[in-house]
């Protein structure tokens, strides 16, 4: 058996709803033993502070800057992650010395790939001190220094998972993660690896529900299921410059905006935005070298019934099959956190986190900043 490291991955995504935690044992290459996972929701108050921090982040010109609320927010965010780790270890009956490394994503507050600028708040050194566990953080920056988009980083993990797909799933396979922003990873039958952000995921739907005072998201897609797609609005989204041309890029929260209040009713708006999220995946997949036969879907968006219905219908028109990651033997909620654990081990081993075909970097690039308690 190869030398395995126990790693915890911590992910706080663009939906800003909480922290996903996952434990795995891996050699950073092909051997992956997926263990436990959990999540910790942010309070409404802290979520509001994060959203306010996004406004302050617009002033950042250098990635070390922390204007306005961001310095204190970074400190408090890190302490919440430390609490999440302590609680998780207690639940699993583990001690800090039994964990080799934490992969710490932090919270993205600004992502401008065209300016080679990406900012994830989160103090890796503080997290290491608070948990007593070595930490690898800031994993996107090195990719940008080599001309990459800084995202997506999960494809290296998807490639390892692709080697263990259930029998009967036909390739080429695309792993789709539907978070606030959706991204896809194409694994060709020849092992080719291609990845990029595919468009808005839950982000617009969540914002639409909040705009109307109906909570933070559309549980199960129930609101969308009672509405109809407004084709003119959907067409406007899908004609966005992001989808044009062959050059793929990563997205920031500000690249797409919700319709004005009153432009659509609540249900039709939710259904239209669910359709847009699904259609964006298929539209982005049209840039791949071969049409996918299977889409393996993870992330919170797979729990939106309307979005999944639209995605399934669109994929079936192209002869493709859509499957929930849970039904493919994976954990659709924990996959990103698992990826961050896996990437932390790869970082410690000096292995690439990104490739020219996944982020546009000029060569395979490792990355991450390691810190000890």
From Swiss-Prot:
Q: Which GO terms describe its biological process?
A: 1,6-anhydro-N-acetyl-beta-muramic acid catabolic process; amino sugar metabolic process; peptidoglycan turnover
Is Ribonucleoprotein there in the keyword field? no
Top-rank taxon, per record:
Bacteria
List the InterPro entries hit by this protein, alphabetically: Anhydro_N_Ac-Mur_kinase (IPR005338), ATPase_NBD (IPR043129)
Stated role: Catalyzes the specific phosphorylation of 1,6-anhydro-N-acetylmuramic acid (anhMurNAc) with the simultaneous cleavage of the 1,6-anhydro ring, generating MurNAc-6-P. Is required for the utilization of anhMurNAc either imported from the medium or derived from its own cell wall murein, and thus plays a role in cell wall recycling.
Q: Which family does it belong to?
A: Belongs to the anhydro-N-acetylmuramic acid kinase family.
Q: What is the designated name of this protein?
A: Anhydro-N-acetylmuramic acid kinase
């Amino acid at each position: 058996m190869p030398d395995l490291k126990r790693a915890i991955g911590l992910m706080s995504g663009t939906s800003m709803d909480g922290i996903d935690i996952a434990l795995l044992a891996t050699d950073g290459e092909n051997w992956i033993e997926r263990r436990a996972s959990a999540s910790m929701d942010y309070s409404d108050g802290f979520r509001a502070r994060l959203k306010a921090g996004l406004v302050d982040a617009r002033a950042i010109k250098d990635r070390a800057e922390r204007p306005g609320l961001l310095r204190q927010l970074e400190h408090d965010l890190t302490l919440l992650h430390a609490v999440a780790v302590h609680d998780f270890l207690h639940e699993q009956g583990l001690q800090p010395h039994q964990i080799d490394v934490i992969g710490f994503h932090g919270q993205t507050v600004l992502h401008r790939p065209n300016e080679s600028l990406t900012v994830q708040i989160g103090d890796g050194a503080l997290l290491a001190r608070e948990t007593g566990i070595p930490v690898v953080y800031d994993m996107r920056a090195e990719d940008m220094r080599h001309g990459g988009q800084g995202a997506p980083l999960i494809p290296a993990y998807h490639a390892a998972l692709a080697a263990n797909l259930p029998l009967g799933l036909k390739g080429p396979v695309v792993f789709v993660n539907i978070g606030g922003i959706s991204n896809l990873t194409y694994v060709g039958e020849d092992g080719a690896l291609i990845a990029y952000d595919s468009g808005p995921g839950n982000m617009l739907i969540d914002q639409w529900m909040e705009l109307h005072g109906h909570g933070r998201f559309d549980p199960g897609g129930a609101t969308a299921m009672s509405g109809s797609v407004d084709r003119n609005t959907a067409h406007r989204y899908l004609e966005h410059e992001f989808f044009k041309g062959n050059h793929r890029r990563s997205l920031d929260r500000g690249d797409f905006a919700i319709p004005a209040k009153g432009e659509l009713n609540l249900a039709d708006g939710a259904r239209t935005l669910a359709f847009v999220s699904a259609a964006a995946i298929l539209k982005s997949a049209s840039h791949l070298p071969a049409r996918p036969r299977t889409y393996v879907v993870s992330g919170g968006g797979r729990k939106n019934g309307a979005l999944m219905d639209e995605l399934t219908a669109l994929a079936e028109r192209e002869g493709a099959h859509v499957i929930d990651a849970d039904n493919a033997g994976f954990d659709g909620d924990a996959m990103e956190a698992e990826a961050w654990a896996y990437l932390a081990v790869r970082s410690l081993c000096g292995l690439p986190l990104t490739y020219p075909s996944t982020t546009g970097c000029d060569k395979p690039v490792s990355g991450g900043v390691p810190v000890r308690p």
